[in-house]
Amino acid sequence: MKNKLPPFIEIYRALIATPSISATEEALDQSNADLITLLADWFKDLGFNVEVQPVPGTRNKFNMLASCGQGAGGLLLAGHTDTVPFDDGRWTRDPFTLTEHDGKLYGLGTADMKGFFAFILDALRDVDVTKLKKPLYILATADEETSMAGARYFAETTALRPDCAIIGEPTSLQPVRAHKGHISNAIRIQGQSGHSSDPARGVNAIELMHDAIGHILQLRDNLKERYHYDAFTVPYPTLNLGHIHGGDASNRICACCELHMDIRPLPGMTLNELNGLLNDALAPVSERWPGRLTVDELHPPIPGYECPPNHQLVEVVEKLLGAKTEVVNYCTEAPFIQTLCPTLVLGPGSINQAHQPDEYLETRFIKPTRELITQVIHHFCWH
């Protein structure tokens, strides 16, 4: 029953008080089971059917899908339940206690992005879900901050095909219809160690990596020349050399060298295409030194994403907000949800607060976010 639903600020407080950190380090990683249970109970109270989905390959993580209404199409509102870890020494407040001060709500996940679920639940108080003409779906995912395993698995396994979706990441209520992807690789070269007094008796992995880097930088230049998307502030795919390590002593021939790099592809560039370009760039080194060079993923790749600019979802949201859609350089779960239906990224709070000490959401977002959620539900589920 709706009268069982706590007040908005108490929903928010309970979400922030329930830790759900995702991290690659097992010691920091936490299950989101308790948070999923909270959300599931609240949506059941509102009359939704709720399905909780274990996410394979994770440390006890779950997705939740709440659904109401019959038929095809409808609207999907989506967000992730996890947060990044926090640096205790840099926070001046308890990250798990919602604190309101000077027009701001402080806490880990206030902006990115547990708060979005509080806004959805609050908006649904005034919606008679029994009268929906099209279905409404609420998706809460796991592990967005690390592998995006929750969104990947949901997109791979669901039969749902809504008319459209909105992911409530913090965009300051500015609608986002496209972003770049992210590919992160480790280039590893295995040499042959030996005493530095006789270089010919070994294979110096640093020297081979020097050769490989030259080819990678040529790929970077080629990407910049061949691919363009003028709407982005950086209108071409970027390639960054982020970390390198090799050798262990000045008097030893380096036996191993490893380089970590990333590429941020434009929408429309496929992951297979990029892998092919990287392999082609490194082919001269591999051919000269067979079996010594390998390329491995550091993280599961994320493709670029774009919602068609003339789609009804874009037109409706631009009209409701009086603002044009934008493109951004950071990544979200949108590429995976977009495989199901046209998708926008749109939510309260600023991306500048994401992953920051003393994360906060400004209270000025409360009223317009509630109104926006109500309006899009009315438009896509009642018309």
From Swiss-Prot:
Disulfide linkage: none
CDD domains the UniProt entry points to: M20_ArgE
Stated role: Catalyzes the hydrolysis of the amide bond of N(2)-acetylated L-amino acids. Cleaves the acetyl group from N-acetyl-L-ornithine to form L-ornithine, an intermediate in L-arginine biosynthesis pathway, and a branchpoint in the synthesis of polyamines.
Protein name: Acetylornithine deacetylase
Annotated residues for binding of Zn(2+) 1: H80, D112, E169
Location(s) in or outside the cell: Cytoplasm
Active site (UniProt): D82, E144
Species this protein is from: Escherichia coli O17:K52:H18 (strain UMN026 / ExPEC)
Subunit structure: Homodimer.
Gene Ontology terms, MF aspect: acetylornithine deacetylase activity; zinc ion binding
